[in-house]
Design a protein with these regions (language model features):
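Short glycine-biased active-site loop of nucleotidyltransferases that positions the nucleotide triphosphate
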Residues: 34-36, 76-81
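N-terminal accessory segments
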Residues: 1-34, 40, 59-67
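Short clusters of hydrophobic/aromatic residues that line enzyme substrate/ligand-binding pockets
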Residues: 20, 29-30, 76, 96-99
Length: 121
């Protein structure tokens, strides 16, 4: 990684309420999913709230890098691996937000696991 982007990632880390990892171990853990593909990401973010997501989007836009959304990493086609910042929402974005029985809809955060939703219903 370039020294400048490393400094910028450290600065970003101080503004997030969630977690941001750029160490080799975390990057290697998130370099693959259930597919055969492997790409070492720039960093791994575990945002805690919507503001963290906004800060990550602003950072990616400013530094011309991608954000790769991820939850369980069960993709068989490599959608959640890449050279940008992996954004893992499975730790903090796990709330069921709304159940509308008349419309038969449920609004959830992206980290909600299907089995947990089924148990809740």
């Amino acid at each position: 990684m370039q020294n400048e982007i490393v400094k910028e990632l450290k600065a970003l880390r101080t503004t997030l309420e969630g977690d941001l990892h750029s160490d080799d171990l975390m990057r290697k853990l998130y370099a693959t999913d259930a597919s055969v593909y492997r790409k070492l990401p720039l960093a791994v973010a575990l945002p805690k709230n919507n503001n963290d997501i906004k800060l990550l989007i602003d950072f990616a836009k400013t530094h011309h890098t991608s954000l790769i959304p991820r939850t369980a990493g069960t993709s068989l086609a490599g959608q959640c691996v890449g050279e940008g910042i992996v954004v893992d929402v499975s730790k903090y974005f796990t709330r069921i937000l709304d159940i509308n029985e008349s419309d038969k809809t449920v609004t959830v955060q992206p980290g909600v696991v299907r089995d947990e939703l089924n148990n809740y219903l």
